[in-house]
From Swiss-Prot:
GO terms for molecular function: DNA binding. Keywords: Cell cycle, Cell division, DNA-binding. It comes from Mycolicibacterium paratuberculosis (strain ATCC BAA-968 / K-10) (Mycobacterium paratuberculosis). The lineage of its organism: Bacteria, Bacillati, Actinomycetota, Actinomycetes, Mycobacteriales. It holds the Pfam family WhiA_N. One of its GO terms (biological process) is cell division. Residues 275-308 bind DNA. The keyword Cell cycle applies. Involved in cell division and chromosome segregation. Gene3D superfamilies: Homing endonucleases (3.10.28.10). Belongs to the WhiA family. The keyword DNA-binding applies. InterPro entries: Homing_endonucl, Sporu_reg_WhiA_N_dom, Sporulation_regulator_WhiA, Sporulation_regulator_WhiA_C, WhiA_LAGLIDADG_dom. This is Probable cell division protein WhiA.
Length: 327
């Protein structure tokens, strides 16, 4: 089951005792899932949702809170409709329901955002407003780099009302217009978790958090592996470059190179991938890695000085891009 469906399924089964919160949820769900239509001179309230559980919850709440019967029509998946949809309609008492839920104001005009009683209600009402909005048009992506909790909104006023409700819950949400559609987005992982709990999807939050932690552990392991690989590549390139410079130094100095420097240089050339510590153990007699490094440094310095005096390519000239690319 996708994360969005898991959240909606859990929210649709949530038991809410507060009448005010239940009313706020119904109002928000109707506002975000549908709208008001004039049919034959009458106001009809409609809401379209993607889960049967959500449609049944909304129908039950409308009847228990307002006493109106709603009819649910099932639109089966076909053609461009990828999944089954559920359309809830209140026709006979549409105007009365719209006024009581605050979707119409006292003058009978549609409210563009969320009604004042929801926006200025209690914290439980703010939670319910988010719950209704998510049940209507919410989505939750899997944890990851682009994880987000989003709600598609019917307009900018509704989006701003939802942002305000999130702020009251201590959650940072942003209103965005994407391809002409208004959305409210929460991207921070901690904020997503907090909002899931606030809405009432605690079980799904635990699943989401577990997946998030697993992904972070994998990402950390991958970063460390990449870091180790990069270090190995750098070390290999450095060893190849050092061996090439030593080879050139031995060419420049010829028979004039001191024996102790020559022996250290030959070790570097013969064992290109070995570390300085390993070269020290291979020396006869064995040396510390600092002693090996010191001798190679003096060998290169001596060769570069001679190359400068004679006007010939120095040891750095042996380190070509092709050489490092093959390392």
């Amino acid at each position: 089951m996708a994360m969005t469906t898991e959240v909606k399924d859990e929210l649709s089964r949530l038991v809410v005792k507060s009448v005010s919160a239940r009313r706020a949820e119904v109002t928000s769900l109707l506002r975000f899932a549908g709208g008001l239509h004039i049919v034959g001179g009458r106001v009809v309230v409609e809401a379209e949702v993607d889960l049967g559980n959500v449609a049944r919850r909304l129908r039950k709440d409308i009847f228990e809170l307002y006493g109106y019967n709603a009819v649910v029509h099932v639109l089966s998946a076909s053609g461009i409709r990828k999944s089954t949809r559920y359309v809830l309609r209140v026709a006979n008492d549409g105007e009365a329901l719209a006024r009581q839920t605050g979707l119409l104001d006292n003058r009978g005009r549609p409210v563009r955002g969320l009604p004042a009683q929801v926006v200025g209600g209690s914290i439980a009402d703010a939670e319910a407003a988010w719950r209704g909005a998510f049940l209507a048009h919410g989505s939750l992506t899997e944890p990851g780099r682009s994880s987000a909790l989003e709600v598609s909104c019917p307009g900018p006023e509704a989006a701003l009302a939802l942002v305000g409700a999130a702020r009251r819950l201590g959650v940072s949400a942003k209103a965005r217009e994407v391809r002409g559609a208004d959305r409210v987005v929460v991207r921070d992982g901690e904020a997503i978790g907090a909002l899931l709990t606030r809405m009432g999807a605690q079980d799904t939050r635990l699943i989401w958090e577990e997946r998030r932690m697993r992904r972070e552990v994998r990402a950390t392991a991958n970063r460390l592996a990449n870091f180790d690989d990069a270090n190995l590549r750098r070390s290999a390139r450095a060893a190849v470059a050092a061996a090439a410079r030593v080879e050139r130094a031995l060419e420049i100095l010829g028979d004039t190179v001191p024996d102790h420097l020559a022996s250290a240089g030959k070790l570097r050339v013969e064992h290109r991938q070995a570390s300085l510590e390993e070269l020290g153990r291979l020396a006869d007699p064995p040396m510390t890695k600092d002693a090996v490094a010191g001798r190679i440094r003096r060998l290169l310095s001596m060769a570069d000085r001679k190359a400068k005096i004679e006007g010939i390519p120095d040891t750095e000239s042996a380190v070509t891009p092709d050489l490092l690319e093959d390392a």
